[in-house]
Amino acid sequence: MKAVILAAGYATRLRPLTDSIAKQLLPIGGRPMMDWVCDKVEEVTGDIHVVTNARFAGDFGRWANGREGVTVHDDGTTSNDDRLGAIGDIAFVLDRAGSDDDLLVIAGDNLFDFSLSDFVEFWRTKGVASAVTVYDCGDLELATHYGVVEVAEDDRVLGFEEKPSEPRSTLVATASYLYHRDHVPLVGRYLAEGNPPDQPGRLIAWLLGHEPVYGYRFTGAWFDIGNPEQLLEADNRWRARLGHPPRETYSTLS
């Protein structure tokens, strides 16, 4: 299995912090966010590909130094205006690293409690299928900011709607995906058909019309870090786990 960790965005909502530091390298609980994500990914594979942009490729290269099995890919973009988009970045890595294996895709700015080993075990029981992690956010207003999924009793995903104005449920897709090796070439087909290259949930929505996709429900902590409030909340949650006092404002200092 290959893993692709998405870290090529420009995190404009976190400026000025992200003018000089990639969001995924900001410290959470005293460690770069990517450390926590990569620790999780290493539960299931040692073939890890991090895709980032030209602005921060050197920083990610230094971060990866000493981490066995981690390859950093520079997608060549330099600003939010010329970014490839998450799905474009997945295709970029597959072109460089090959597309002949099962694929785990995970966002580098998502922190969570569940075990990726459990996610993989769940997915392997479904045969030739892909899977997405799903979480009950518990609030219809909050659900408008995410992709809302409809899941059958057997866990098969029946529907997906990206950021609906009137969500039908509070069950949302989170940014962890497993693609069977037979489905991986469909990433290129999705893009070749002219579909949007951003928001990986759109790929799942498209895939539903072609192949079976299952939803893995999880509980516990989950942070999709996109703004200063979420960054501070995640930092304080991880600091508390380490026995450190909470902060009123976020700081990159330990």
Language model segments and positions:
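Short alpha-helical oligomerization interface
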Residues: 19-24
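A structural signal for short hydrophobic beta-strand segments in well-ordered beta-sheet cores
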Residues: 25, 149-151, 215
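A short acidic, often aromatic-flanked loop/helix-cap motif at beta-alpha or helix-coil junctions
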Residues: 77-82, 140, 166, 222-224
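Short, surface-exposed amphipathic charged segments that create phosphate/polyanion-binding patches used
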Residues: 84-91, 145-148, 230-233
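Catalytic-core segments of class I nucleotidyltransferases/pyrophosphorylases
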Residues: 111, 120-124, 153-224, 228-253
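Conserved donor-nucleotide/metal-binding helix-loop-beta segment in metal-dependent transferases, i.e.
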Residues: 114-143
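Conserved catalytic core of nucleotide-sugar-dependent glycosyltransferases
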Residues: 141-157
